[in-house]
Amino acid sequence: MERNKDLTEIVDPERMISFGSSDFEQTVRFYQGSKAQITEQDFVLGSIDQLHRLGVHSSAYNDAVDTMGDLTTAICLLIIDANLMRHANPVRNPGGMLRAMTRQHKAGRLNLIGSLIGLDQKLKRKEWVGEA
């Protein structure tokens, strides 16, 4: 759980949801409701609602949660969602990617912080050139 806390301190949840699709963001906002801030629960529930749209089977999700916890799995789903929209090398098997991320986590080699920093830099470039 300590690692989960570090991730949310590094990337603001408001910024983080802008990395993914508008569907992902709208679903998290639905759970946020009238609250001033997005909570961990809003983020997790919103990501669960994306499983079918992303094509991630519930068994892959459950394995990920059992291994990484709710928040880390939700962040993985956001990263997968964001990478579905890549121009170069888009994710073609989201469920397979989640399973691979789960294996990487088990092996101590999953670098979510690096992925989030990369998505943040990509978003900043889009904002800078007026694409976002």
Locations of the language-model features?
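Electrostatic interaction modules used in gene-expression and signaling proteins
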Residues: 1-132
